[in-house]
Amino acid sequence: MRALLSVSDKEGIVEFGKELENLGFEILSTGGTFKLLKENGIKVIEVSDFTKSPELFEGRVKTLHPKIHGGILHKRSDENHIKQAKENEILGIDLVCVNLYPFKKTTIMSDDFDEIIENIDIGGPAMIRSAAKNYKDVMVLCDPLDYEKVIETLKKGQNDENFRLNLMIKAYEHTANYDAYIANYMNERFNGGFGASKFIVGQKVFDTKYGENPHQKGALYEFDAFFRANFKALKSEASFNNLTDINAALNLASSFDKAPAIAIVKHGNPCGFAIKENLVQSYIHALKCDSVSAYGGVVAINGTLDEALANKINEIYVEVIIAANVDEKALAVFEGKKRIKIFTQESPFLIRSFDKYDFKHIDGGFVYQNSDEVGEDELKNAKLMSQREASKEELKDLEIAMKIAAFTKSNNVVYVKNGAMVAIGMGMTSRIDAAKAAIAKAKEMGLDLQGCVLASEAFFPFRDSIDEASKVGVKAIVEPGGSIRDDEVVKAADEYGMALYFTGVRHFLH
């Protein structure tokens, strides 16, 4: 038996090599891997000695040789293949262990294009693909986490075709991921991220019980190990729908730096939000906006879930809590609640990945765009359109309302008062309907909107929403502007003594 080991990530390779040697494998290797194995007392043959061909062009050509690929690819059950191998002095290679040059790491650490190019692996992917193609005869490894499993399988004599097939699938996933990252990087560098092809690659974190509905299959995939690093289940497991709501709630609650923000989300839309002097007060005021919709919702906490906050949340049924951190006494509060799910990021405040791009599936393909964000200076740079200016407190509320609106399904309007959302209308086909629905819900909840502010994620096409806002005492409004009837909207604001700001930036969300 013969194994070829050539790895960039050398974690566990010495131990793996020793185990293979003990199992009777002859070991071939290259470069740094060869040196490391030899230094650790493993009998190893350098590939250039095996092929009788030197490494060429500063190591660019090492393993691209018929004796390597012939040794991997020839079928052991095909008499013609065996005959050709003997005629050409090609010896079988039964195990290939390769992981690739750290291209991604290099792009993160350096902008030197020559260095980046040199970290595109050629021989490694070729060997992995060859071994994967001939999986019926050859084992292929590209992940150090598989070393122990492979050794145990070999020791137990369970190296069957099904075992090798699973390694084969993983190998092709590995090379596809590698090539996709290279192609995306080149398009990002030279085509602004929008090249002729776009590759979206995720790593599976876990299967969900089902998808959006029980008859659908679902799973969570991640970019750059974000969930593995920042998502820990403390109580129960997240469903498919939980994950989408957690995403919406976390994105909103984490958008205010270190502020004690609480967001309550139901079916992807916020039904409560507040920033008060502490998290307990934030939760109390967030819940007031729509305590009916909050039932069975997701609560995101930009800080630590402690016992006091846990007791307050425990007064109603919420399905999910996602908190930056959770203390033990808080967990104890929910000990007898079987249905609640609790997750933490184990950090002082909530963490977002800030993905640069966003995509949505459409029938037959997907649309792809830069991710939307409310700029830090968006309100600061907004143009005052009215005669009246907003007060300092109103400006704080306008910023909160703006950010909530950006994370809410269009068409939407958001009313905020003293740091808390007091009304919201979302997902409506007309903006005036969103405005009216929000006011109706606020009245149902017994909330006083007098003195609140209003934000809209897109322009008001008519003055009717301003007229409605005046009836409940709105004092300041922020919107993008851009309607052919902007003059009518400005006139209405001045009639009612409102402050009106145009940001020039729309935040549709579909």
Curated annotation (Swiss-Prot):
Family label: Belongs to the PurH family.
Cross-referenced SMART domains: AICARFT_IMPCHas, MGS
Keywords: Hydrolase, Multifunctional enzyme, Purine biosynthesis, Transferase
Matching CDD domains: IMPCH
A Pfam match: MGS
UniProt GO cellular component terms: cytosol
Name of the protein in question: Bifunctional purine biosynthesis protein PurH
